[in-house]
UniProtKB/Swiss-Prot annotation:
It is found in: Cytoplasm. The lineage of its organism: Bacteria, Pseudomonadati, Pseudomonadota, Gammaproteobacteria, Enterobacterales. NAD(+) binds at G12, A13, G14, G15, R16, M17, E38, G102, T103, T104, A126, A127, N128, F129. This is 4-hydroxy-tetrahydrodipicolinate reductase. Gene3D superfamilies: Dihydrodipicolinate Reductase, domain 2 (3.30.360.10), NAD(P)-binding Rossmann-like Domain (3.40.50.720). It comes from Salmonella gallinarum (strain 287/91 / NCTC 13346). Pathway: Amino-acid biosynthesis; L-lysine biosynthesis via DAP pathway; (S)-tetrahydrodipicolinate from L-aspartate: step 4/4. It catalyses: (S)-2,3,4,5-tetrahydrodipicolinate + NAD(+) + H2O = (2S,4S)-4-hydroxy-2,3,4,5-tetrahydrodipicolinate + NADH + H(+); (S)-2,3,4,5-tetrahydrodipicolinate + NADP(+) + H2O = (2S,4S)-4-hydroxy-2,3,4,5-tetrahydrodipicolinate + NADPH + H(+). Homotetramer. NADP(+) binds at R39. Catalyzes the conversion of 4-hydroxy-tetrahydrodipicolinate (HTPA) to tetrahydrodipicolinate. Belongs to the DapB family.
Length: 273
């Protein structure tokens, strides 16, 4: 990797998250914006990435070819869609580039491809790059160990109208954190929809509810409900910049890593809590 600064390439440069990542990369000390990518045929190709993100000229031109910019970055940051991310993953694996992956909605085969690639390159793969969300995941583990065996657990998440996967990756990570603390597999205890005559709630399950509306950046609540009381642990994001800063922080953290699969809790050192 480049010794002076970590050079990053950003996928989906013209999207909501891509623009935030460009802004964060241009503002963060120790980070250099090396490349910005968009899909082939995009009207944004040839634009200056900084101007596209509204922060002034950067000198980095939006391109569609990873091959053309392979010498301009050390870490590839991807918050796009699974099919595109897996294509980028194969390229980064071939060329020894680190990756920060914030894409959600992978199937089991996609997740396995990421695990296999991490044997050769360093990857931070997280459902959410917010510091607050990752602190929340740790709190959920602790709450589950105390209340999980006797309370009803429900996870409610809300996002903007354009989000294409449900439940959100963060909601699933919350469920996995809770299930893991209870020595369960989320696949065996998750309930993702309720409609019509459902009968009484099955003890030991983890329910999910999804809201898609307006421009909600992201809201997540885990409820531990018993008779007479309930505990709710909530995180609300008001700006995507919190995710962008977390992703750039992860890229900096990867500078000393040659290979391995990590998540945001590794970056933040939350295992000590």
């Amino acid at each position: 990797m480049h010794e002076a600064q970590i050079r990053v390439a950003i996928a989906g440069a013209g999207g909501r998250m891509g623009r935030q990542l460009i802004q964060a990369a241009m503002a963060m000390e120790g980070v250099q914006l090396g490349a910005a990518l968009e899909r082939e045929g995009s009207s944004l190709l040839g634009s200056d990435a900084g101007e596209l993100a509204g922060v002034g000229k950067s000198g980095v031109i939006v391109q569609s070819s990873l091959e053309a910019v392979k010498d301009d970055f050390d870490v590839f940051i991807d918050f796009t869609r699974p099919e595109g991310t897996l294509t980028h993953l194969a390229f980064c694996r071939q060329h020894g580039k680190g990756m920060v992956i914030g894409t959600t909605g992978f199937d089991d085969a996609g997740k396995q491809a990421i695990r296999e690639a991490s044997q050769e390159i360093a990857i931070v793969f997280a459902a959410n790059f917010s510091v607050g969300v990752n602190v929340m995941l740790k709190l959920l583990e602790k709450a589950a160990k105390v209340m999980g065996d006797y309370s009803d657990i429900e996870i409610i998440e809300a996002h903007h109208r354009h989000k294409v996967d449900a439940p959100s990756g963060t909601a699933l990570a919350m469920g996995e954190a809770i299930a893991g603390a209870l020595d369960k597999n989320l696949k065996d205890c998750a309930v993702y929809s309720r409609e019509g005559y459902t009968g009484e709630r099955v003890p030991g399950t983890i329910g999910f509810a999804t809201v898609r509306a307006g421009d909600i950046v992201g809201e997540h609540t885990a409820m531990f409900a018993d008779i007479g009381e309930r505990v709710e642990i909530t995180h609300k994001a008001s700006s995507r910049m919190t995710f962008a800063n977390g992703a750039l922080r992860s890229a900096l953290w990867l500078k000393t890593k040659k290979n391995g699969l990590f998540d945001m809790r590794d970056v933040l050192g939350l295992d000590v809590l």
